């Protein structure tokens, strides 16, 4: 391994707007390209990208915009629906956004004439996280600074409502058992809810605040990761409600934590935009130091490719992609 893990982005894509959030589609979409969505001050853009790591005849990255959706307000979060398919006739693009006006918008498009959106209203403060139920895609969970986690159906009706003790920062759905939901709070508590019984069944404590982001490891659902204060933290929920591992990473406070979709030992973190740049790091649990470090002028958002050890971050009028090894 190289001594210096710092490096520039492997690939970049120019965008027409500052990128606040970016998300690879985490679900199989029936097509060879990888769907990606990013949001700026006014728009959500849906595109496909293919990388040389997966297609021999591609040089670097091949990117194509499929559709731009007018949003009218800053986009803060994006979640893909598992109902999205590129191989159906017509194709189905389905995703939802959270925005600065405290509303969730559910978009459906066939990439031709049908472009619909529905507004889900109810949160009374900033929405920090949202996610579709990964099996059927018939429900959306969201968490907010208003100290609630809410479950919505696709008609915009709230089907469940959990009162939190502090702002809700992240929400994740169990990939197989869709009645299990993980909610992370800013006060350092991570709770698992049983949606059938509508009650908490387990909780973890970070012992550090503020907890800014947490993520359930989809390769091993006994693992949960988070960033709180300057540190990353990892729990094994079968062993303790306190972290098994933790390490300081970002001097200017850590911001986001995301597990890789292909390895239970690989994860990425970002720091808050500092005076000069946002720090981005990829970590491997077998290595004491980050295996890759990058810096983005004004970075926000963080997402892993579904099948490659590749991350994307949004920046000033661009998307930046980093590649690592598993």
From Swiss-Prot:
Keyword Cell division: yes
Keywords: Cell cycle, Cell division, Centromere, Chromosome, Chromosome partition, Disease variant, Kinetochore, Mitosis, mRNA transport, Nuclear pore complex, Nucleus, Primary microcephaly, Protein transport, Repeat, Translocation, Transport, WD repeat
Gene Ontology, cellular component aspect: cytosol; kinetochore; nuclear envelope; nuclear pore; nuclear pore outer ring; nucleoplasm; nucleus
Transmembrane annotation, as ranges: none
Transport among keywords: yes
Ranges for the WD repeats: 6-54, 61-109, 115-154, 159-195, 199-237, 242-282, 287-324
GO biological process: cell division; chromosome segregation; mRNA transport; nucleocytoplasmic transport; protein transport
Family annotation (SUPFAM superfamilies): WD40 repeat-like
PROSITE patterns xref list: WD_REPEATS_1 (PS00678), WD_REPEATS_2 (PS50082), WD_REPEATS_REGION (PS50294)
Subcellular location per the Swiss-Prot or TrEMBL entry: Chromosome, Centromere, Kinetochore; Nucleus, Nuclear pore complex
Major localisation: nucleus
Its job: Component of the Nup107-160 subcomplex of the nuclear pore complex (NPC). The Nup107-160 subcomplex is required for the assembly of a functional NPC. The Nup107-160 subcomplex is also required for normal kinetochore microtubule attachment, mitotic progression and chromosome segregation.
Known partners and oligomeric status: Component of the Nup107-160 subcomplex of the nuclear pore complex (NPC). The Nup107-160 subcomplex includes NUP160, NUP133, NUP107, NUP98, NUP85, NUP43, NUP37, SEH1 and SEC13.
Disease: Microcephaly 24, primary, autosomal recessive: A form of microcephaly, a disease defined as a head circumference more than 3 standard deviations below the age, sex and ethnically matched mean. Brain weight is markedly reduced and the cerebral cortex is disproportionately small. MCPH24 patients additionally manifest mildly impaired intellectual development, cerebellar vermis hypoplasia, and fifth finger clinodactyly.
Name of the molecule in the record: Nucleoporin Nup37
Species per Swiss-Prot/TrEMBL record: Homo sapiens
GN (gene name): NUP37
């Amino acid at each position: 391994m190289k001594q210096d893990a710092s490096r520039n982005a492997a690939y970049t894509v120019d965008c027409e707007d500052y990128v606040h959030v970016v998300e690879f589609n985490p679900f199989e979409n029936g097509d060879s390209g990888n769907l990606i969505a990013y949001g700026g001050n006014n728009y959500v853009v849906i595109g496909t990208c293919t990388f040389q790591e997966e297609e021999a005849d591609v040089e670097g990255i091949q990117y194509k915009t499929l559709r731009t959706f007018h949003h009218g307000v800053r986009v803060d979060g994006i979640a893909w629906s598992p109902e999205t398919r590129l191989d159906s006739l017509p194709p189905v693009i389905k995703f939802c956004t959270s925005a600065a006006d405290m509303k969730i918008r559910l978009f459906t498009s066939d990439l031709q004439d049908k472009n619909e959106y529905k507004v889900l209203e109810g949160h009374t403060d900033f929405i920090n996280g949202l996610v579709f139920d990964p099996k059927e895609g018939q429900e959306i969970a969201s968490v907010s600074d208003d100290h609630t986690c809410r479950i919505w159906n696709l008609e915009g009706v709230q089907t469940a409502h959990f009162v939190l003790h502090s702002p809700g920062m992240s929400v994740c759905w169990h990939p197989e058992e869709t009645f299990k939901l993980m909610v992370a709070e800013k006060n350092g508590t991570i709770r698992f809810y049983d949606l059938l019984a509508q009650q908490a069944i387990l909780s973890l404590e970070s012992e550090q605040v503020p907890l800014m982001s947490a993520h359930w490891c989809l390769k091993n659902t006994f693992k949960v990761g988070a960033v709180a204060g300057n540190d990353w933290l990892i729990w094994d929920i079968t062993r303790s409600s306190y972290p098994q591992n933790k390490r300081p990473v970002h001097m200017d406070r850590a911001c986001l934590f995301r597990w890789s979709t292909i390895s239970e030992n690989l994860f990425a973190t970002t720091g808050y935009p500092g005076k000069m740049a946002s720090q981005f790091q990829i970590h491997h649990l077998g290595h004491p130091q980050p295996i890759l470090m990058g810096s983005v002028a004004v970075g926000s958002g963080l997402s892993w490719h579904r099948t490659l050890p590749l991350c994307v971050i949004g920046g000033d009028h661009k998307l930046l992609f980093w590649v690592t090894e598993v």
